[in-house]
Amino acid sequence: MTDQSHQCVIIGIAGASASGKSLIASTLYRELREQVGDEHIGVIPEDSYYKDQSHLSMEERVKTNYDHPNAMDHSLLFLHLQALKRGSAIELPVYSYVEHTRMQETVRVEPKKVIILEGILLLTDARLREEMNFSIFVDTPLDICLMRRIKRDVNERGRSMDSVMAQYQKTVRPMFLQFIEPSKQYADIIVPRGGKNRIAIDILKAKISQFFE
């Protein structure tokens, strides 16, 4: 855990795929932005840091286990968090779920007073945990996560239901049990029921608001 006097405060939100992490992150961002302004708060998704696979064939890319820590470029994310804390802008990678690789373009992210970082594997990496001022684990039952994941991946990411189910059985559930669920022990706050937990969101807003005082 880092000292709260740092210029840029990093808040980590982790949990299973489709647990409601993104909803909590976007809700906190939207509501706090209305209070403090867009220049003071931002969101960075861990998904942007999936490793570049442009050197692989599409057949090889689709075999990648996206739920294993090795699929993530956490070294780059770590360097970017350090840069933001120094007051430097970063070039955020852009990842395509259709092409299964990183795109050539990037998105410039300026340092903010508060950065909300969200992703499934954030708490599995000790380097990232050390950069966080505090961390949250969204604890949603796996059956609910699966239903949400099917709806999301089919509608938003161009996947078939069969491919989503096959991936869930082969990698998503096993990797959750092996890596993601055990990382819950490192969270400072555990939020049940995901983005629908209004009381938890209000508590988190109050906690984060302290960094703007």
Curated annotation (Swiss-Prot):
This is Uridine kinase. Its EC number is 2.7.1.48. CDD domains: UMPK. One of its GO terms (biological process) is UMP salvage. Pathway: Pyrimidine metabolism; CTP biosynthesis via salvage pathway; CTP from cytidine: step 1/3; Pyrimidine metabolism; UMP biosynthesis via salvage pathway; UMP from uridine: step 1/1. It holds the Pfam family PRK. It catalyses: uridine + ATP = UMP + ADP + H(+); cytidine + ATP = CMP + ADP + H(+). Belongs to the uridine kinase family. The keyword Cell wall biogenesis/degradation does not apply. ATP binds at G15, A16, S17, A18, S19, G20, K21, S22.
